[in-house]
Amino acid sequence: MNLSDFDYFLPDELIAQEPLPERDMSRLMVVRLDGKEFEHRLFKDIVDYLNPGDALVINETKVIPARLVGRKEGTGARIELLLLRRLDSSRWEALVRPGKKAPKGTAVVFGEGLLACRILDSTAYGGRVVEFSFEGLFEEVLERVGVMPLPPYIKKPLLDQQRYQTIYARQAGSAAAPTAGLHFSPGLLSRIREMGVAVIPVLLHVGLGTFRPVRTEDIRRHRMHAEYYEITEEASRAIAETRARGGRVIAVGTTTTRCLESAAEEGGRVRPGSGWTEIFIYPGYRFKVIDGLVTNFHLPKSTLIMMVAALAGRERILAAYREAVGLRYRFFSFGDAMLII
């Protein structure tokens, strides 16, 4: 299966540059797994497609201010870091730009000396291992020095940083938002619970595995970067109870899907625990846990569009994307949503 099989045409003006004023007023395209025609609604209408006894599984990760802009000691050259994952109390894996100006041993200072780092080594995927020096709690220093890591296709400054967090974000650690969850408002989530749908939290910290581009034409040669996940005993039990009563398990987002499918056992049981996942889901994959998916519209040739194609079929997803372009849906992180069910 080739990378070009997952390409599509998208005019630049359809890339959403800011969130809508109301989270749940984005548009919703419904893609039915039974092959019925696509439906076009508002996101708040998602309740019309949920049944009492179903479960929505959400990713409660929280985005950290993972983007750091500093100066190289000695030359003053501008160096930018994107924190990917924490290794211990002072060491992180990070993407560094420009990489050619940041060989092993490079020292970088951020925030007028509040934070500094030294580059210790390179990683297999072109990143760096960096060691920070600071006083106090790293999280507090990062809040003062770091900024929200918006994707590069968003050119407009984000005035309200909380709009790049889900309303249920709890555990800090992501370098990007689980964007399908951005559409849920407190009122909508309450309404979903009141109608007898379980809302089950799991955790996957979004890192390079989610947004790293595919560089190989044969997609089977692509290797995912590991991302950390956790599933509690309570969440595992709640999913099993949903299955037992005949309900559907609907994942909110591709990151939730990766989490659940990484811990899946035959028969649809989800194993509780924590670990690192490198699962790569593309057409031909047999889903073990999820029956439906809430997701955004993804970049051409990305691992994320490959995942939704694995669930709904490549040709059907590309047809849905063509229709969305024709109807001028808003795309990517701050864009509109799709429900595959």
Curated annotation (Swiss-Prot):
One Pfam match: Queuosine_synth
Keyword Transferase: yes
Keywords carried by this UniProt record: Cytoplasm, Queuosine biosynthesis, S-adenosyl-L-methionine, Transferase
Enzyme class: transferase
Cellular-component GO terms for this entry: cytoplasm
GO molecular function terms attached to this record: S-adenosylmethionine:tRNA ribosyltransferase-isomerase activity
Protein name: S-adenosylmethionine:tRNA ribosyltransferase-isomerase
Keyword Cytoplasm included in the entry's annotation: yes
Database matches in InterPro entries: QueA, QueA_dom1, QueA_dom2, QueA_sf
Organism of derivation: Pelotomaculum thermopropionicum (strain DSM 13744 / JCM 10971 / SI)
Compartment(s) where it occurs, according to its Swiss-Prot or TrEMBL record: Cytoplasm
